[in-house]
């Protein structure tokens, strides 16, 4: 019989993850040294990449930082990569780490302004089709200049706040009472139909907004973390990045917005739910109450946030400094002029992005393994051996398929580095490199909406507090994203193959 201490170790290992998942990760850790001894470093490295992708695909079972971190720690100990190679990767991609550390935190301090904007939109527009289009378009516009993760966080905050307000009223609970919005036990039968319709309404808006972040995020240097990686390798600043990607991103944006309208009109794939009149009345009363509470100090803070947003956009457009440093500027401006000087208040802004920043370091460790073992060199050589006109389309497909099951930052890092090495070795012209860089950028951004694993914003939505409240499961997200995946992936491939 096992001792209480050994049982405690077993329970503590990877926390609340399922037992089968814990055993799988342990099996990986035991298999890798044996495989290195029997099959050599290249085979072991390929298996490690597959194991790491598995941890990304199982992100709902356990955040990938812990199992992925254990795998790369073992890889470093086994000599599949060196700590120096990992450090070199981190130095090379330091602008991306700056982006995640400071830009996401900077936008956190604009949340009040963004919450007000989305709240006014939700209650001010009565046509569900128009509302969905505006949510998608606004998310796209914001994601082009801000961080897609933060835009998604704002939309989630609006949805959680409004759901909690109506759920409390439907449950008959007073505002002063503690209650759990995750359970419907106290909701009478009379209100349940409205509650389910409201859930479907919020689900569709959340998905439209999440897709909007992908539509806008692909367009600019700061829209997604991998864009900055690609732009850094290609030497593109903000305006140049937009110009290079526009032949693909602009038609796909238009097609995505049209898809949004058609889905709401057809009421297919889980879209088309309306906001019940009774729910609208409750939410309108809540919004009016919040507006009455807003004093001169709060209004001044909103004005500061709006001015900081303007500084942010101008700073990005003119590339006055690295993106992350502009984010730090936003933090300083907003906190200084809104009176946020408490260390703990400021610290909350960094909670959202730092786990993902740590995970990105683990990504780069896997990339270091790939580089040191030359795993992707044969694949890139096979693509480059194709006729030049077929290479962008094939890279788009290769990136898209892998991005749908893995994280697109990870995929983009691998491919853009390999293609840059081919350019440096004189295997292609600069013009052709630019075309392939666009193919990699769009290939990792557009088809990756197929599953929550591909887009960080989608994964954030799925693992957020709103997902269980509105019954947004992994399978439902895949189903609701399917029409967008087909349109964005199909048109993106055509544009990359024929319009670049």
Swiss-Prot record:
Locations listed in the record: Cell inner membrane
Keyword Cell membrane set for record: yes
Superkingdom in the source lineage: Bacteria
Membrane topology: Multi-pass membrane protein
Record-annotated membrane-spanning stretches: 28-50, 68-88, 98-118, 121-141, 145-165, 205-225, 244-264, 311-331, 350-370, 394-414, 449-469, 477-497
GO cellular component terms listed in the entry, alphabetical order: plasma membrane
Activity modulation: Inhibited by amiloride.
Signal peptide positions (record): none
The keyword Transmembrane helix appears for this protein: yes
Influence of pH: Optimum pH is 7.5-8.5. Activity decreases sharply below pH 7.0 and is null at pH 6.5.
Catalytic function, reaction form: 2 Na(+)(in) + 3 H(+)(out) = 2 Na(+)(out) + 3 H(+)(in)
Disulfide bonds: none
GO molecular-function terms, A-Z: sodium:proton antiporter activity
UniProt cross-references to Pfam families, sorted A to Z: NhaB (PF06450)
Keywords from the named record: Antiport, Cell inner membrane, Cell membrane, Ion transport, Membrane, Sodium, Sodium transport, Transmembrane, Transmembrane helix, Transport
Similarity-based family: Belongs to the NhaB Na(+)/H(+) (TC 2.A.34) antiporter family.
Function: Na(+)/H(+) antiporter that extrudes sodium in exchange for external protons. Can also transport lithium.
Identification of the protein by name: Na(+)/H(+) antiporter NhaB
Organism this protein belongs to: Pseudomonas aeruginosa (strain ATCC 15692 / DSM 22644 / CIP 104116 / JCM 14847 / LMG 12228 / 1C / PRS 101 / PAO1)
